[in-house]
């Protein structure tokens, strides 16, 4: 449990938040949520990048829209989240280049993963994010690893830490990313885990209820499509969901190709109870895009 000192920090953090408002002229006061069957979350980095939002802006938006989490925030921001009754649905550990597919990076990665697991357990946050890494990290002090060896290495590495995650009641997530889009942060050419079935094999190979798949609908659409059947095929191992519009990792809506309401209904059908994080880079007023996303994903 957090210490008394942490509790005092939560109170101090919360007292200043009411004076902050998201940097948007279109924010309406009423939450768009009606059904609330999907636990919706906002991924902060997108709005920091696209709209120059501060953490306080994203928290304010989450509260206004009825979201229950602001995710991807480092632990130093968790007191502020706690003060506003919000979770951090996932926290990052190591990066997506130097991942778990190469033993050269195991020591550093496992150290920070263990630290994040402990922090999540203390604050009651559910997930720590991890990556396969790039196939070729020669320039980063690693080497070149084949698909098969990369899979074996990932499974071996995760088995070194998964017992600690189980003990602490925290889930370790593996994220699938697309390699087709070369635009910065819209795709990740060189990433080894660009096949959803490959990532699913790693997760299942670890064979733990605390090892799950981060199913990013945007990335899966670019690499594979067939979203609804892929959600079905992964239903036993999905631990987190991300959204964004395609093409362009833009807002969710009528101007892009992914139809999100059926995907959300599919999640309810397969019994998914985790978070759905909105991870699009805004191209217009961010509150307009977020409000639309929250409304589209608020299915009955």
Model-found features: residue ranges?
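Short acidic, glycine/proline-enriched helix-loop-strand junctions
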Residues: 79-91
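Active-site-proximal loop/turn and secondary-structure-junction residues that shape catalytic pockets
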Residues: 46-48, 74-76, 94-97, 134-136, ...
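Active-site acidic/histidine proton-transfer and metal-coordination neighborhood
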Residues: 11-20, 32-35, 99-212, 222
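Catalytic domains of carbohydrate-active enzymes, especially glycoside hydrolases
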Residues: 57-77
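Conserved beta-strand positions in the central sheet of alpha/beta enzyme cores
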Residues: 71, 90-92, 129, 173, ...
């Amino acid at each position: 449990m957090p210490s008394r000192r942490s509790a005092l920090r939560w109170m101090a953090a919360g007292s200043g938040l009411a004076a902050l408002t998201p940097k948007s002229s279109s924010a309406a006061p009423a939450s768009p949520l009606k059904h609330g069957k999907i636990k919706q979350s906002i991924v902060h980095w997108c709005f920091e990048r696209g709209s120059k939002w501060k953490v306080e802006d994203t928290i304010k938006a989450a509260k206004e829209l009825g979201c229950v989490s602001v995710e991807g925030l480092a632990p130093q921001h968790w007191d502020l989240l706690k003060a506003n009754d919000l979770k951090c649905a996932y926290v990052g550990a190591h990066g997506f280049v130097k991942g778990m597919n190469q033993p050269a990076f195991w020591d550093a990665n496992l150290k920070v993963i263990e630290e994040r697991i402990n922090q999540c357990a203390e604050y009651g946050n559910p997930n720590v994010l991890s990556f396969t890494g790039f196939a070729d990290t020669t320039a980063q002090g690693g080497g070149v690893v084949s698909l098969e060896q990369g899979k074996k290495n990932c499974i071996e590495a995760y088995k070194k830490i998964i017992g600690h995650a189980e003990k602490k009641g925290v889930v370790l997530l593996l994220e699938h990313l697309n390699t087709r889009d070369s635009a910065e942060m819209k795709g990740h050419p060189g990433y080894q885990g660009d096949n959803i079935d490959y990532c699913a094999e790693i997760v299942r190979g670890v064979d733990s209820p605390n090892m799950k798949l981060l199913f990013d609908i945007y990335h899966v659409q670019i690499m594979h499509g067939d979203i609804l059947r892929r959600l079905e095929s992964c239903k036993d191992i999905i631990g987190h969901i991300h959204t964004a519009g395609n093409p362009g990792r833009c807002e969710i809506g009528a101007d892009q190709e992914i139809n999100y309401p059926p995907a959300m209904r599919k999640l309810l059908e397969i019994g998914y109870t985790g978070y759905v994080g909105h991870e699009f880079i805004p191209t217009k007023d961010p509150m307009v895009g977020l409000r639309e996303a929250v409304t589209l994903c608020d299915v009955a």
